[in-house]
Amino acid sequence: MEITNVNEYEAIAKQKLPKMVYDYYASGAEDQWTLAENRNAFSRILFRPRILIDVTNIDMTTTILGFKISMPIMIAPTAMQKMAHPEGEYATARAASAAGTIMTLSSWATSSVEEVASTGPGIRFFQLYVYKDRNVVAQLVRRAERAGFKAIALTVDTPRLGRREADIKNRFVLPPFLTLKNFEGIDLGKMDKANDSGLSSYVAGQIDRSLSWKDVAWLQTITSLPILVKGVITAEDARLAVQHGAAGIIVSNHGARQLDYVPATIMALEEVVKAAQGRIPVFLDGGVRRGTDVFKALALGAAGVFIGRPVVFSLAAEGEAGVKKVLQMMRDEFELTMALSGCRSLKEISRSHIAADWDGPSSRAVARL
């Protein structure tokens, strides 16, 4: 049976993967209200397509932090991809390069920055948590720089891990044959005592709860790489990110895995975009499963989107070929949405191309009986 959309990959992944692994990737925090809402909120935004526009040629290319990519759809950091497929992050990196887009590598990857770099050329970002031992952070950043990574995506919504009840029930641990490769060959100081199977829980325990804006400033003193602040969902924090020299913002609720009952990212996006005032680009992750979702995010002011779970599920289903297919499907759907909305380039996508549930009656056509 031919796979025709991204959602079908999740069903295949659920069949193929051990329950503990599938649940780790698929679940969210506590009641999982935000997990469902990340998806559902997109359905409360409708299109206002413009017609009789020559859409023979559609240009989806864009420039992110100075790097030209083929489309505004990029790969979000997801941990431990070798649980999904033996090739893990290698496969994802190759698929991203083939699609001409950006891959973000998780610090908690089962392949190291050097291994991912060895797959060949590509524009790659490195996701970073800040640990209690700043020396560990500095070593990770150095390695990412040396491996040719182009930006740091600093995760700021995780002073502690969210309560993911599926993982508690399943007693989630990283399978014994896998390890968090970015922590190999790093002087972990006190962290050395942990064996591999305990390393993932130990590393999680080393995330610094005292992380604050001053650490964003500190990070800029140890690296010249641009820093994207990942996990902003309010105007207040968007303004602070701009003030503290962030190169960009990723509107993210960590795939609904941290604090439940935060808004869907697509609901928080416009507030953040307005607060950033065009001074730095704003990106979105969370719940993007269709090309229509990508268009809606761009219409609300996003410079691009990142996809996470679709990558992991397609990787589990079909390895590198699966990830390539997901990127191609999203690209094709997005191109079709642009054509049917009368937009020939990303700069033509505007707020007037959508009507959201929260818009006032003045901005929405009132149906006459």
From Swiss-Prot:
Glyoxylate binds at residues 24, 129, 164, 254, 257. GO terms for cellular component: peroxisome. The keyword Acetylation applies. Changing residue 24 to F: 10-fold decrease in affinity for glycolate. A motif (Microbody targeting signal) lies at residues 367-369. GO terms for molecular function: (S)-2-hydroxy-acid oxidase activity; FMN binding. It is found in: Peroxisome. PROSITE patterns: FMN_HYDROXY_ACID_DH_1, FMN_HYDROXY_ACID_DH_2. The modification N-acetylmethionine is found at residue 1. The record marks 108 as: Involved in determining the substrate specificity of glycolate oxidase. Pathway: Photosynthesis; photorespiration; glycine from 2-phosphoglycolate: step 2/3. Its main location: other. It is an enzyme of class 1 (oxidoreductase). Binds 1 FMN per subunit. FMN binds at residues 77-79, 106, 127-129, 155, 230, 252, 285-289, 308-309. Keywords: Acetylation, Flavoprotein, FMN, Glycolate pathway, Oxidoreductase, Peroxisome, Photorespiration. It catalyses: glycolate + O2 = glyoxylate + H2O2; a (2S)-2-hydroxycarboxylate + O2 = a 2-oxocarboxylate + H2O2. Its cofactor is FMN. InterPro entries: Aldolase_TIM (IPR013785), Alpha-hydoxy_acid_DH_FMN (IPR012133), FMN-dep_DH (IPR000262), FMN_HAD (IPR037396), FMN_hydac_DH_AS (IPR008259). Homotetramer. This is Glycolate oxidase.
